Structure formats: structure tokens, C-alpha cells
Amino acid sequence: MHIPDNYLSPSTCATLFVAMTPIWYYSIRKINKTLSADKIPLIGIGGAFAFILMMFNLPIPDGTTAHAVGGTLIALLLGPYAACIAISVALFIQAIIFGDGGILSFGANCFNIAFILPFTGFFIYKILNKIHLSPFYHKC
């Protein structure tokens, strides 16, 4: 669920935007070093996938909605840094064109949806994979 404008104070929104700035910078640098040029378009596909998933809202009690993001899936396929950039771009387009979330709360939404979600899912998967509890692990 996107955080709407005027839900958080402007100082909180500004703090989270400033917190996201080095994360975006480091993510772009990491992508340039680790992903080959032929995989860069996959980031756009991942962003489009996240964009589509976030457009399907499901009503939940108390008059709000929830939606899938696909951040962990993108992180598992392309890495958490690529997922961070892909989801941030999708959130920006949604904030500008559709008004989902908001311009002021863009940094807060990116922090929650584009940073915490893919990195947490990615590292939980890695930990479960190491101790052989991954749903994708099977003995040969």
C-alpha cells in the first residue's frame, strides 16, 4: 500500500527521501558493475511487472486497499539493487501519472517498497537456501 501525501509529516518524507538518495546511487553503481549490458533491459521489464502488479488493488477492511509488488521476485531474478531501481521507477510513474502514493511521500514509499521489500525478501531467501529450507531446494 502506498503512503499517501499528507499522511507523514514533510520532515519525515524529506528524511526518507534523503535516506534513499545514497541507496539509489549505490544501486546504480552496483548494477553497472554486476549486470551485463544485455540484462539491463530486464530491469525495465521488472519495473513494468511491478507497475502492473501495483495497479491491481484489492479492498481490505477499514476502507483501504492492498496490492502485490513483486519486489522479492525481481530481486531473486536480477538482484536486490536492480529491484530497488526498477520498483523506484514504477513508483515514480505511479505517483506522477496516477497519483498513487504521492510526490511528497515518494521517498517514504521507495524506502518501504523499493528498498526494504526486495532486500529483506532476497536475504531471507539466501538464509533459507543456506540452511536448506528454501522451497526451491531439493535433494538430488
Predicted regions: what is each one?
Residues I113-C140:
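Short helix-perturbing small/polar motifs within transmembrane alpha-helices
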Residues H2-T15, M20-L73:
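Hydrophobic transmembrane alpha-helices
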Residues M54-L117:
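Alpha-helical membrane segments and adjacent membrane-interface helices in multi-pass membrane proteins
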Residues I28-N32, L58, Q94, F98, ...:
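Membrane-water interface at transmembrane helix exits
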Residues V18-I23, A86, I116, T120-G121, ...:
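Alpha-helical transmembrane segments and their lipid-water interface positions
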